[in-house]
């Protein structure tokens, strides 16, 4: 092979190698592009699947469930058809109260991230029950818990978590900025009512499914406040009671009818000798019954019952088994205020059954200790102090606090009646204990027509905490 042939041969081989290398590079680029496209398409497809979108001819809503995984909120979509909670059923017949939940939040909060709270309450949709609570913008066993005995501050917020769980930043969802609040579900969405602002000009912010729908301004400029428990929904309308005015004298009390977050009607009660605060309300056969706190001059509890047009009746529980705290020893009651030890009070509740009444109350007459349920078969209309059932749920030696009612609709339970339930706040810390903070845990019970038991389900936390020493 002469030199020219060698040059041509070597050149040809180099050209072939170069072409092959170019083809390989192009193939590599195409392969990377295809791989990227497949991954992107797969991620998009997975996202669509996780949303689990189903199209119905009727309306649907998305219930967001927060799952605590490595301190990360993961939202799992769950589509469900909406219903209307009619509230037309009567209360279920019951023989006693079965323990439903206990969150142990103070015990857990000694070592875990748990909110400093007060005023917890429970409300149920047709799918779930949630614990609502007013945080102090602080965690237990942390320096910002100092001074949280104060009721009203710009740091307080209404939040909620699954019932029975300790309220923490990892399982709770924000509802509203508030130092007084209420919430309820009409079958289609959550209504929340959060009151915040200065004492002489507070505003209630109404939200429906998380969106602001209306506001209500303080009309007496004297600490506008609401229930600190669930509102009541009947046939798509929800009802709440607000108070504005003195806590130790005649104030102004209004009932609000709300549809999808918008006030459609309101009325002021004509109750010149009554005092209504922190009402515990529930639906019963298409009407709403509220049992409230008289902080002015009554040691028995005032009530107001109204229909969907806000036509109302008022009175006091007549029984000589008194339900407020402080209160005198049981004796002769009154269908008006019982003035003995009538000043001050505590949020509470009762359930009416015809002429009879289940009364929830602290075991102590003078302090927020213990809790018991009493069945007075004639207590709604008669003034004697005879009762036939007493069930203890918190011992006299253990702390209690606020209490309130909530119901489970037939759409949730599958029963043909409205199940009555109640919760009890177990307050710990200041002003009675040597801590820098005030907070509470909660327990709840539901009525059953079967066997129950007397016991004590106390808070159980050992104080003081590290931050208090």
From Swiss-Prot:
Its EC number is 3.2.1.18. Inhibited by the neuraminidase inhibitors zanamivir (Relenza) and oseltamivir (Tamiflu). These drugs interfere with the release of progeny virus from infected cells and are effective against all influenza strains. Resistance to neuraminidase inhibitors is quite rare. The active site is at residues 151, 402. The influenza A genome consist of 8 RNA segments. Genetic variation of hemagglutinin and/or neuraminidase genes results in the emergence of new influenza strains. The mechanism of variation can be the result of point mutations or the result of genetic reassortment between segments of two different strains. It catalyses: Hydrolysis of alpha-(2->3)-, alpha-(2->6)-, alpha-(2->8)- glycosidic linkages of terminal sialic acid residues in oligosaccharides, glycoproteins, glycolipids, colominic acid and synthetic substrates. Residues 91-469 are annotated as: Head of neuraminidase. One of its GO terms (biological process) is viral budding from plasma membrane. Homotetramer. This is Neuraminidase. Its main location: virion. It is found in: Virion membrane; Host apical cell membrane. It comes from the Viruses. Residues 28-469 are virion surface. Its cofactor is Ca(2+). GO terms for molecular function: exo-alpha-sialidase activity; metal ion binding. Substrate binds at residues 118, 152, 277-278, 293, 368. N-glycosylated. Ca(2+) binds at residues 294, 298, 324, 344. Disulfide bonds join 92-417, 124-129, 184-231, 233-238, 279-292, 281-290, 318-335, 421-446. Keywords: Calcium, Disulfide bond, Glycoprotein, Glycosidase, Host cell membrane, Host membrane, Hydrolase, Membrane, Metal-binding, Signal-anchor, Transmembrane, Transmembrane helix, Virion. Residues 36-90 are annotated as: Hypervariable stalk region. The chain crosses the membrane at residues 7-27.
